[in-house]
Curated annotation (Swiss-Prot):
Transcription factor that may transactivate seed storage protein genes in developing seeds. It holds the Pfam family Zn_ribbon_Dof. One of its GO terms (cellular component) is nucleus. The gene is DOF5. One of its GO terms (molecular function) is DNA-binding transcription factor activity. This is Dof zinc finger protein 5. It is found in: Nucleus. The keyword DNA-binding applies. It comes from Oryza sativa subsp. japonica (Rice).
Length: 211
């Protein structure tokens, strides 16, 4: 190494001919490089932080979406189950109500006219369980719960022979008597021209009228 060149370690430069020369360019370049590295690192770090922040919210949003989808699916299943139960409950209630109405209608009720217990349930009026139709066998009357008493002829529901009047009875007896007392008469072989005694009373022989 040259004798006239001495390094000045304390000042960071070298001594030339009794003068200390500082390494300004080198120091400035290194400082600039160091500053540039720091700035670049500072620039890179925020970008990485932003990317990490973006990744974290993206992961959070994906997790939230998955949880929201699961909650929606659970709600749909609950609604379906609840809807099925709600749809099945009214049907069961209707069946129970109809069964109770039929059981109540099947019980014999006293007739509102004659108070007889000899009654029977016929059917539901207008297919309504609240209007059971009953029939009284004693007075032959139909009535509906909550309705008016229906008048039915006494002979309804029974097939009977029609009663005969006095003229019909007389005509019937006359036919029976004629059938019992009618006798065929034949002429006597000795007198072929002589009429039968049966016809003699009905058609008497006279001179004006030949036989």
């Amino acid at each position: 190494m040259l004798s006239h060149v001495e390094m000045a370690p304390a000042a960071g430069g070298f001594k030339l001919f009794g003068k200390v020369i500082m390494q300004c360019g080198v120091s400035e370049g290194t400082q600039d490089k160091a500053q540039g590295f720091v700035v670049a690192r500072e620039k890179v770090e925020p970008e990485e932080e932003e990317e990490e922040e973006q990744r974290v919210p993206a992961a959070a949003t994906s997790g939230q979406r998955a949880s929201i989808k699961r909650e929606a699916a659970d709600r749909d299943e609950e609604q379906r189950q609840g809807g099925g139960d709600a749809a099945g409950q009214p049907t069961q209630r209707r069946l129970q109500d109809s069964a109770e109405a039929r059981a109540a209608a099947a019980a014999p009720l006293p007739c509102p006219r004659c108070r007889s217990r000899d009654t029977k349930f016929c059917y539901f009026n207008n297919y309504n369980v609240n209007q059971p139709r009953h029939f009284c066998k004693a007075c032959h009357r139909y009535w509906t719960a909550g309705g008016a008493l229906r008048n039915v002829p006494v002979g309804a529901g029974r097939r009977k022979n029609r009663p005969l009047g006095p003229l019909a009875v007389a005509h019937h007896n006359h036919h029976h008597r004629a059938a019992a007392g009618f006798v065929l008469g034949f002429p006597n072989p000795s007198s072929p021209t002589s009429p039968s005694p049966v016809y003699t009373d009905r058609w008497p022989v006279t001179p004006d009228r030949p036989f």
